[in-house]
Amino acid sequence: GLYGINNINRILQNNNPNDAIIWGINTYKVGDPILFNESNIFSPLIHNNTKGKIVGIQPKEFEIFFTIELEQSINEIEASGYDFLLEESKQGKSIITFSINKYASTDEDNDGNVVPFQVAYAVSIHKSQGLEYNSVKIVITNEVGEQITHNIFYTAITRTREKLKIYWSPETEKTILDSFDGKKSLTDAHILKNFL
């Protein structure tokens, strides 16, 4: 829908002024925030939900090279045995370069043609578990308001370090807040007062 993760990511990526590189069915731009997914290509060193940013893209005829700035530090010893080039590390972040093949290998265990990350200007509440951001914007439409449990709401509002903004209608706000029991609501109210 209009407020779905894929649509929001597309809209926000369109505001990135860098050149679009289309690879398969996906579009990538230098500057795109990304999240590594369940692919085992760099596991366990770079795991599901590792955050990063695309800092370089070099498409070739049969492969594409991505340079990613990770929000974690990796040293040369940790990187040995993985199929990426560890470049410089600065301010607690490492930069890696790796290639993805255009076509699938005949080896069923080979993920060499699978891009191991997704563009992540926006992520679902479920996908955001365990992550932190300086600024969080939450969109809760009327259609999903009744599905937001206390635990889901708590997860959503506690992803931020500094700024929180919730976009919802007055009706959706009332539905969600009325669904919480008294003790938990006081805790949530305290958390919200600190960020709103």
Features from the language model and the residues they span:
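Core RecA-like ATPase module of SF1/SF2 helicases and allied nucleic-acid translocases
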Residues: 1-196
